[in-house]
Amino acid sequence: MAEQSFMIDWSRVPDFFTRWNKRFDVDAMNGTVGNFEVVYSSYAPDNIYDCLSGDVLSNDVQITQTVDCGLVWDEQGTISISDDVIWTIGDEIIPLKAVFIRNKVNGYVMGYSINQTSFDITNQVILDADTVLWSIHTGGYV
């Protein structure tokens, strides 16, 4: 089966996604430093553990696309993905079934959502584009 290209219908995405393409660095629990990427999939199993091998995406995850990204989060440490984010192939609309946040260096999954619209990334530390260190675990600047 030929690989199909997917694209976001950006007209359906809220204004806060204007920060989408800014890069953020993460100091992962194992000490490696790398960029986040978002992994989109139009397939989602019933159980998250079917997607993961340890904390790494398993080979049977049908990856639609990966995108280098910045993240939008609130003070509770939740990263929001809009319900209106959709994928299209021509005129066909394909709903997102699974989204993962992954460390590009080691492949570890930092957060995920299956048939939902948010990620819990408690205990991760994010460095934003203005070099402000934000600790989601403590809920404040550090």
Language model regions located:
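Small cysteine-rich, disulfide-bonded extracellular modules of the LU/uPAR three-finger superfamily
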Residues: 1-98, 103-142
